[in-house]
Amino acid sequence: MQTIAIVDYGMGNVRSVQKALEHVAPNDKCILTSDPKIIQESDRVVFPGQGAMGSCMRALELNDLISEIKLSSKSKPFLGICLGLQLLFGYSEENNGTNGLSIVPGDVIKFNNNDLKIPHMGWNNVNQVNNHPLWNKIDNNSRFYSVHSYYVNPTDTSCVVGMTEYGHSFASAIAIDKIFAVQFHPEKSQSDGLQLLRNFVEWN
């Protein structure tokens, strides 16, 4: 039995992530936690998030989680979801400029096309532009559920493994070493989302 730590810092519906993981990994221990020690001792980490990036960074600081998130992202399988993807980057345009965790070089940019509905909300295709174990048994251009007003712009585009079209193409999934992070919500994306979580649980 392995332990999967779901980082709970008060931002977003982490219980839905926990329930989805418990469904695909019934023999594993899926813990909601804000305790850096539990995260450190876990086998895998899931880093979800919703809301404003500035508020999330303050919550991470208050819970003394920043150093452990940085360590875990380099030492064990690590899945970022939605704002959990954006927080990995160095800088966001949100809140008149917000610094992130600077784990992944690049920026977080607001959709600025006046013809688009913001936030980008609903189902959209993800083009698997690079192979990765977390795409196993998921058809290319499968649809996933998203809710976001900002998108990530990595400095090194070789880390991009998924692209989505909304006004223009943007990175909706990245992978660097032990990190896999997505803009969409696998826990809300029915069978393909559950398959991605299953792949994460089995990824070595």
Give the location of each predicted region.
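Extreme N-terminal starter segment of soluble prokaryotic enzymes
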Residues: 1-5
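Short acidic low-complexity segments
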Residues: 29-41
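Short acidic/histidine-rich motifs immediately flanking catalytic phosphotransfer sites
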Residues: 39-49
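Cysteine-nucleophile active-site neighborhood
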Residues: 51-123
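Pocket-forming structural segment of enzyme catalytic cores
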Residues: 90-166
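Short, surface-exposed beta-strand/loop micro-motifs that present aromatic residues
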Residues: 168-175
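Acyltransferase
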Residues: 182-204
